[in-house]
Design a protein with these regions (language model features):
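C-terminal catalytic lobe of FAD-dependent flavoproteins
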Residues: 117, 212, 221-222, 233, ...
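Short beta-strand to alpha-helix junction loop
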Residues: 18, 25-28, 53-62, 101-120, ...
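Iron-sulfur (Fe-S) cluster-binding segments and ferredoxin-like electron-carrier domains
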Residues: 238, 372-382, 406-424
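Flavin-dependent oxidoreductases
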Residues: 138-144, 149-243, 252, 261, ...
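Glycine-rich FAD pyrophosphate-binding loop
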Residues: 1-6
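Low-complexity, small/polar and acidic-rich linker and loop segments
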Residues: 421-444
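Dinucleotide-binding Rossmann-like beta1-alpha1 core, especially the glycine-rich loop
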Residues: 9-89, 98, 214-215
């Protein structure tokens, strides 16, 4: 879930991609689908709309170019706001702002919960997941791919979908396809602010460049404000470290939109890595290779990849139909997923009733975000179990407040060890190699 969970968390409306590209087509379709499926899957989703803010006369003229591009892409409801209309929406905006392009269909989402929710729903409908399973090579028969070789054995299928993100180019080359592309890892760094110190209502963008939508300022589904990203060439595909220079760059650019931002109120930083294709078009690559049957490549799915994701799935279905695959809709498919209980969102009456049923919900483990032991146990025993500290954190939002886990860490380790029947030294932050406790200093 690397890039899928470390991004701007925006369901873009679709005004930015060049018309007549896969990005343009799938962004607009994907946006519409997200509005439909987010409630079904219990995904935190806020219909905020977004504003592209112009500073000065020259930038205001560029809003009309973006407006025309959005109309060509089929984005509904676009409107250019004058200065007064913009300040009524966001009074903290730079006084030099001259107007904005308003896109009402843009939204913010919790990207990790969205990814997890889709996976849990898939599992409920019969999909099997294999974790810590590494792809090694393809299995061929008569020049057709019929399966894959992994560290846990061989698996066979009529089709293999290469959706390996940052490594999708390497998978495609492993199959000896004619795809002439490399994934260039471009890092984007972000800063998260304390929700009690800094508040905006919407998503704010600067005028975009050819290569980036720029440094945004956005509300989140959890009430915090997030700023970023920048765009720097990553050291490698796993380079998610944040840098002093990157933080300074983000703050400087964000202050062009809201000058009153105070970096002292930041509580966390993170970075994600974009899967930027080396092709000149910079468009999504979604294809069945002409020289290799049985494989579908999804390469270069950078922004607006998350917003486009459900539409990409439908696009792949059409590719399969085009080559003669007879697909049947699963009649008993259940699109509904029950979301996790979030204690802090409940009314006092609902809290009392829940604690009566299960006293574990009455024991607060994370004070900042009011996450209870009951929620942690739910996450550990969920359809796709949380077996690490970060797994718990992502599902419950534990450890994301002002103290960044300083209070809850030892308590979560104890709960994980107890529920998984493991020694505390075996509990990890995010999987093998990230053990938190190395040894006991004494026995109790």
């Amino acid at each position: 879930m690397n890039t899928s969970s470390a991004n701007s968390a925006i369901i873009h409306s679709g005004y930015d991609p060049k018309p007549d590209t896969k990005k343009a087509l799938l962004n607009v379709k994907g946006n519409k689908i997200w509005h439909e499926i987010a409630p079904e899957l219990g995904i935190p989703f806020k219909k905020t709309g977004s504003f592209v803010v112009a500073i000065g006369t020259d930038e205001f003229k560029k809003l009309f170019e973006l407006f025309d591009r959005g109309i060509a892409n089929g984005v509904p409801g676009l409107k250019i706001l004058n200065r007064d209309e913009l300040f009524k929406k966001e009074p903290l905006i730079n006084p030099d702002a001259t107007g904005a392009l308003f896109a009402p269909t843009a939204a913010v989402i919790d990207p990790f919960t969205a990814t997890l929710a889709a996976a849990e729903n898939a599992k409920a409908n019969g999909v099997e997941f294999l974790f810590e399973t590494s792809f090694l090579d393809f299995i061929y028969e008569n020049k057709k791919i019929i399966g894959i070789i992994t560290n846990k054995g061989n698996f066979y299928s009529n089709w293999v979908i290469n959706s390996a993100g940052l490594y999708s180019d390497e998978i495609a080359h492993k199959a000896n396809t004619l795809l002439d592309v490399s994934i260039i890892p471009r890092k984007g760094e972000y800063i998260i602010f304390d929700s009690s110190k800094f508040f905006i209502n919407n998503v704010l963008f600067p005028i975009p460049s050819e290569n980036s939508k720029g440094c945004l300022i956005s509300t989140t589904t959890h009430g915090n404000v997030m700023i970023g990203p920048n765009a720097r060439l990553a050291k490698n595909k796993e380079d998610t470290e944040t840098t002093k220079e990157g933080m300074e760059e983000i703050i400087k650019n964000a202050k062009k939109l809201i000058p009153s931002i105070d970096e002292k109120n930041s509580i966390a930083t993170f970075a994600g890595v974009r899967s930027t294709p080396s092709t000149s078009e910079k468009d999504f690559i979604i294809e069945i290779p002409k020289n290799v049957y049985g494989l579908i490549n999804l390469c270069g799915i950078e922004s607006p990849g998350f917003a486009s994701a459900p539409a990409i799935a439908l696009y792949v279905i059409e590719l399969l139909k085009d080559v003669g695959e007879k697909l049947e809709e699963k009649r008993e498919f259940n699109p509904i997923r029950k979301p996790f209980v979030h204690f802090h969102l409940l009314s006092y009456k609902e809290r009392e009733e829940l604690i009566k049923k299960n006293p574990a919900y009455g024991r607060i483990v994370c004070r900042c975000e009011e996450v209870t032991e009951g929620e942690i146990i739910d996450a550990i025993h969920s359809p796709i179990p949380a077996t690490t500290y970060d797994g718990i954190k992502r599902r419950t939002w534990l450890g994301t407040g002002r103290c960044q886990g300083a209070f809850d860490y030892p308590r979560v380790i104890k709960i994980l060890a107890r529920e998984l029947n493991l020694p505390e030294e075996k509990i990890t932050k995010k999987g093998i190699g990230s053990e938190i406790i190395f040894r006991k200093t004494k026995d109790y």
